[in-house]
Swiss-Prot record:
Cellular component terms (Gene Ontology): cytoplasm; small ribosomal subunit
MF (Gene Ontology): structural constituent of ribosome
Gene name of the encoded protein: rpsP
Top-level taxon in the UniProt lineage: Bacteria
UniProt KW keywords: Ribonucleoprotein, Ribosomal protein
GO terms, biological process: translation
Family recorded in the similarity comment: Belongs to the bacterial ribosomal protein bS16 family.
Organism: Helicobacter pylori (strain G27)
Protein name in the entry: Small ribosomal subunit protein bS16
């Protein structure tokens, strides 16, 4: 199953997340199919998600994680 979820990048105590499309069987930071945005939880908070690609992947059956659903509403 294809899922849209966050993968962590950044460094220790300075998280930065990429919004990616990946196979649900892959590890959190394993390979991904496509990167469709990013999320910076530190001040100033910053969210960018490509809505066109998000809608495409949802259209072909990708499921979103709970966190990505909440973030996509804010973006």
């Amino acid at each position: 199953m294809t899922v849209i979820r966050l993968t962590r990048i950044g460094r220790k105590k300075k998280p930065f997340y990429r919004v990616v499309v990946t196979d649900s069987r892959k590890r959190r930071d394993g390979g991904w199919i496509e990167s469709i945005g990013y999320y910076n939880p530190l001040e100033p908070k910053d969210i960018k998600i490509d809505k066109e690609r998000l809608n495409y992947w949802k259209g072909v059956g990708a499921k979103m994680s709970e966190r990505v659903e909440k973030l996509s509403q804010k973006a």
